[in-house]
């Protein structure tokens, strides 16, 4: 038993599918997605944006395919990307057929506008022929007309019924490489819909609060909605939808997972809001560190506390810690133990060098363990 059972999250049991070379569901890590917002026909701009997202750790990227020109550009985009590409399809089912042929790893279809069961069957045939997965993307803003008439408004029962109807369409075609989302911009509606769907099916679930808003408001809304579900063990992949750069969606997605100890990437900073007791400018220091340590992918914890009230206690729980002291000298903790002091003028560069050295040490140890495992085989 864990020594901290109150921190344990038991994930919902789900089937594992493959989206390109990324496993989704089962015991696979919860993957982080985003979506490009460049014109897809501008392949170079789209590829450049994908590269920026890859640099911050994105696992899967969705690309909108509204017309033939976009699916024509998709082939070059898929070839240039290092992560699997998901084609976002609405209204025109033939775009899904073209995207599958262009190398998309997954086809996102919307039950509210993809069309008849015959069209869905054609999409399934294309997916099978090209080794694509499918995401059934139900959205409260584009529910089928008959479901709106039946229920009077978007509600959990309506979203779940839409999802179940389209799951059956895929299963009737003997297709099982699919994941499902039941998104809404209303957190209550989205959470209730996902919880109901999670009880009804065993397929992987793609989490998201759609049209969440700008960077701050959308982050809060997504953290509440997605975080609530993850805390309940629900969710196999996620996308934080923000009116912001896609790279920010990836960062927020990882921060939600980090907060719940479900997946860690990069430096997790514990810092105080600062007050008159601070021995150095905490806000300025943390901002600078977040920028200078953004390239670190290795999971490391770092505490930056302005004074000795909580500083030593937080430092005991992190890999590296700094606590503000008097006369411009600050305590540095390594692995929870007081190690040395550092002066104001040298502190920022010193912390960066400590984190980089710790990351290199961890990666070297990982490589050593991997080599030993390979040798043993």
From Swiss-Prot:
It catalyses: (2E)-4-hydroxy-3-methylbut-2-enyl diphosphate + oxidized [flavodoxin] + H2O + 2 H(+) = 2-C-methyl-D-erythritol 2,4-cyclic diphosphate + reduced [flavodoxin]. Its cofactor is [4Fe-4S] cluster. Binds 1 [4Fe-4S] cluster. The keyword Iron applies. One of its GO terms (biological process) is terpenoid biosynthetic process. One of its GO terms (molecular function) is 4 iron, 4 sulfur cluster binding. Its EC number is 1.17.7.3. Pathway: Isoprenoid biosynthesis; isopentenyl diphosphate biosynthesis via DXP pathway; isopentenyl diphosphate from 1-deoxy-D-xylulose 5-phosphate: step 5/6. InterPro entries: Dihydropteroate_synth-like_sf, IspG_bac, IspG_bac-typ, NO2/SO3_Rdtase_4Fe4S_sf. [4Fe-4S] cluster binds at residues 272, 275, 307, 314. Pfam families: GcpE. Keywords: 4Fe-4S, Iron, Iron-sulfur, Isoprene biosynthesis, Metal-binding, Oxidoreductase. NCBIfam families: ispG_gcpE (TIGR00612), PRK00366.1 (NF001540). Belongs to the IspG family. PANTHER family: 4-HYDROXY-3-METHYLBUT-2-EN-1-YL DIPHOSPHATE SYNTHASE (PTHR30454), 4-HYDROXY-3-METHYLBUT-2-EN-1-YL DIPHOSPHATE SYNTHASE (FERREDOXIN), CHLOROPLASTIC (PTHR30454:SF0). HAMAP family: IspG. Converts 2C-methyl-D-erythritol 2,4-cyclodiphosphate (ME-2,4cPP) into 1-hydroxy-2-methyl-2-(E)-butenyl 4-diphosphate. This is 4-hydroxy-3-methylbut-2-en-1-yl diphosphate synthase (flavodoxin). The gene is ispG.
């Amino acid at each position: 038993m864990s020594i901290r059972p109150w921190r344990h999250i038991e994930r919902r049991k789900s089937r594992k599918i493959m989206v390109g070379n990324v496993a989704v569901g089962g015991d696979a890590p919860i993957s982080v997605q985003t979506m490009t917002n460049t014109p897809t026909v501008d392949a170079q701009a789209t590829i450049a944006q994908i590269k920026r997202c890859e640099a911050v750790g994105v696992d899967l990227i969705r690309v909108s395919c509204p017309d033939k020109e976009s699916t024509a550009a998709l082939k070059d985009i898929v070839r240039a990307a290092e992560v699997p590409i998901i084609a976002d399809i609405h209204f025109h089912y033939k775009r899904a057929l073209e995207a599958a042929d262009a190398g998309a790893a997954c086809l996102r279809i919307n039950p509210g506008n993809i069309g008849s069961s015959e069209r869905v069957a054609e999409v399934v045939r294309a997916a099978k022929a090209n080794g694509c997965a499918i995401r059934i993307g139900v959205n409260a803003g584009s529910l089928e007309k008959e479901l709106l008439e039946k229920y009077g408004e978007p509600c959990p029962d309506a979203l779940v019924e839409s999802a179940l109807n389209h799951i059956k369409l895929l299963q009737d075609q003997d297709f099982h490489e699919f994941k499902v989302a039941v998104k809404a911009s209303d957190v209550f509606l989205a959470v209730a819909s996902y919880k109901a769907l999670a009880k009804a099916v065993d397929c992987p679930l793609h989490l998201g609060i759609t049209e969440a808003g700008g960077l701050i408001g959308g982050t809060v809304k997504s953290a509440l909605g997605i975080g609530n579900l993850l805390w309940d063990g629900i969710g196999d992949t996620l996308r934080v939808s923000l009116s912001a750069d896609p790279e920010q969606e990836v960062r927020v997605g990882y921060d939600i997972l980090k907060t719940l100890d479900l997946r860690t990437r990069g430096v997790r900073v514990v810092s105080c809001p600062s007050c008159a007791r601070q021995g150095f400018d905490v806000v300025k220091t943390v901002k600078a560190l977040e920028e200078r340590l953004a390239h670190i992918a290795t999971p490391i914890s770092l505490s930056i506390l302005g004074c000795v009230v909580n500083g030593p206690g937080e430092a005991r729980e992190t890999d590296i810690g700094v606590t503000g002291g008097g006369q411009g000298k600050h305590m540095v903790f390594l692995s929870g133990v007081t190690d040395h002091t550092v002066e104001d003028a040298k502190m920022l560069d010193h912390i960066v060098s400590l984190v980089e050295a710790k990351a290199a040490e961890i990666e070297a140890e990982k490589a050593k363990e991997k080599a030993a495992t390979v040798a043993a085989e």
